[in-house]
Every structure is written in structure tokens, then in C-alpha cells.
From Swiss-Prot:
Species this protein is from: Pseudomonas fluorescens (strain Pf0-1)
Protein name, as recorded: Ribosomal RNA small subunit methyltransferase A
Gene designation per UniProt: rsmA
Broad EC category: transferase
Catalytic activity: adenosine(1518)/adenosine(1519) in 16S rRNA + 4 S-adenosyl-L-methionine = N(6)-dimethyladenosine(1518)/N(6)-dimethyladenosine(1519) in 16S rRNA + 4 S-adenosyl-L-homocysteine + 4 H(+)
EC numbers, comma separated: 2.1.1.182
Its biological purpose: Specifically dimethylates two adjacent adenosines (A1518 and A1519) in the loop of a conserved hairpin near the 3'-end of 16S rRNA in the 30S particle. May play a critical role in biogenesis of 30S subunits.
Lineage, broadest ranks: Bacteria, Pseudomonadati, Pseudomonadota, Gammaproteobacteria, Pseudomonadales
Length: 272
């Protein structure tokens, strides 16, 4: 980045700017943007990934919260007809406003770690228009996203993201690739929405509710954590052993529990 484009990272925005050319190239090769792709970058920062995506010929919208970066990005990419900049909070951004065709939008970003989980859930609400997502996240978060049943990383984030997407932990990135260097390791993850849900729930809001309740006290058995929602007999009727802990259940089992809850007309989904 040239001196005229320098900008000091702001802690309140969770900014850690990517500067390692080798890492940037590896990310861009993983994304493999092509002419004609419809892409959205969240938190472009100083444009480390932006330039490479634009050079591919893809149509790129970017969403940046930091107002001080807007003129820098506009100046840096002035004259690029495939560049469109939005100043705002990605957590509040209406992705449908991009008018992307179903299963077409490719989302990328070096996400601020303090908003990564709520932002992923916000994106999952728009999974129907998304083709794939590539994110730089805290390594610990990526391990949770990609986790399987039986371990401590398996939880609400793993289950709800894997309900909607295939998860691929691509590679890790050390703190030295950033300025300033974060105190934790990072990783690149690829999320690909399922064309057909492998375990569709009757009501995904009930699935969210069951999973949330189950993991609120993850060391307790299901018959205890879910007692406000399902009786032990109902848990057993769903083909689940009520003496198990939530981390021992796979996605399909949680869907069966949610579907059992859906059979109770008095227990409507709670508002988010």
C-alpha cells in the first residue's frame, strides 16, 4: 500500500489489515474469481483482496463500515467499472438489494473477529442467493465451524452453519500476515450453501431453538437441557437417548428433535 493510502487500523472496528503478498495470492487462488462472477466483499479495509478480485473481471460490490476508508478505496479503485462501494454496517446490510440471481452471489471478506459469528448468521438468512463464501476468521471459529459431533468444538455454530452449508477449512494464517498482528491465529474457510438441504427441518427456527437450549448447559444431559421443550418420552420418540449430552448428537438427531417439537402446536417458534 502506498503512503497516500495509509490508514491506521482502528481497534473499535476490529481492524487487522492483511499485507502478506503470499497469503493474499493464496486466498485469491482459493476464491478463483472469474469474469462474470457477481461478488461481494465485506470489510475490504485497504483493498488487499479487492484489487485481485477486480482484476479477474468479476463484478464487485464492497461494504465498508469505516467512513475514513471510503475516500481511500474510491481513489484507489477509481475508474474501475466493475467496482461499487457501499458505506455501512454489514450486519444491517440488505443483501437482497444487490438483486443477485439465486445461487449466484460469491461473498468474501477478512471479517472483524468481533462480529464474525453474527455476520455469518445474517448471511445464512440470505443463503438462497449465495453461491459460496470465503472468509478469513479466527482459527478457533473456523475449527468450530468445521467440527463434527463428539468434541468440544461441536456446538450451535457448527450445527446451524452445517445445516445450511458445506464447510471447508482451507488453510491457517499466522499473525505476521497482518498489520497490526492479531493476538490469535487466523484461518480461511469456504462455506458452500447446500443445493438441497441434507437434513431439512420442518421449521428451521425450531431447530435453532432446540440447539440453543441444548447447548446453553452443554455438560448436562438432553433430558435436563430440553425439559422445557420436550419430555424425555418425546426425546426418545425422536430416536434420541435422553441421557446423552448435546455434543454427542449429530445434525440429523437435532433435526429429529426439532421436528418432534413441531408436532406440538402450542409451542410456536420464539421471535429471534
Amino acid at each position: 500500500m502506498t503512503e497516500q493510502y495509509q490508514h491506521k487500523a482502528r481497534k473499535r472496528f476490529g481492524q487487522n489489515f492483511l499485507h502478506d503478498a503470499g497469503v493474499i495470492d493464496r486466498i485469491l487462488r482459493s476464491i478463483n474469481a472469474k469474469a462474470g462472477d457477481r461478488m461481494l466483499e465485506i470489510g475490504p479495509g485497504q483493498g488487499a483482496l479487492t484489487a485481485g478480485i477486480l482484476n479477474s473481471g468479476a463484478q464487485l460490490d464492497v461494504v465498508e463500515l469505516d467512513k475514513d476508508l471510503i475516500p481511500i478505496l474510491n481513489q484507489q479503485f477509481a475508474g474501475k467499472s466493475n467496482f461499487n462501494l457501499h458505506q455501512g454496517d454489514a450486519l444491517k446490510f440488505d443483501f437482497n438489494s444487490l438483486n443477485a440471481a439465486p445461487n449466484s452471489l460469491r461473498v468474501v471478506g477478512n471479517l472483524p473477529y468481533n462480529i464474525s459469528t453474527p455476520l455469518i448468521f445474517h448471511l445464512l438468512n440470505n443463503a438462497g442467493i449465495i453461491r459460496d463464501m470465503h472468509f478469513m476468521l479466527q482459527k478457533e471459529v473456523v475449527e468450530r465451524l468445521a467440527a463434527g459431533p463428539g468434541g468440544g468444538d461441536w456446538g450451535r455454530l457448527s450445527i446451524m452453519v452445517q445445516y445450511h452449508c458445506r464447510v471447508e477449512h482451507l488453510f491457517n494464517v499466522g499473525p505476521g500476515a497482518f498489520n497490526p498482528p492479531p493476538k490469535v491465529d487466523s484461518a480461511i474457510v469456504r462455506l458452500v450453501p447446500h443445493a438441497v438441504l441434507p437434513h431439512p427441518a420442518k421449521d428451521h427456527r425450531l431447530l435453532e431453538r432446540v440447539v440453543r437450549e441444548a447447548f446453553n448447559q452443554r455438560r448436562k444431559t438432553l433430558r435436563n437441557t430440553l425439559k422445557q421443550l420436550l419430555s424425555n418420552a418425546e426425546i426418545e420418540a425422536a430416536g434420541v437417548d435422553g441421557s446423552l449430552r448435546p455434543e454427542q448428537l449429530d445434525l440429523a438427531a437435532f433435526v429429529r428433535l426439532a421436528d418432534k417439537l413441531a408436532e406440538q402446536p402450542a409451542k410456536a417458534p420464539e421471535a429471534d
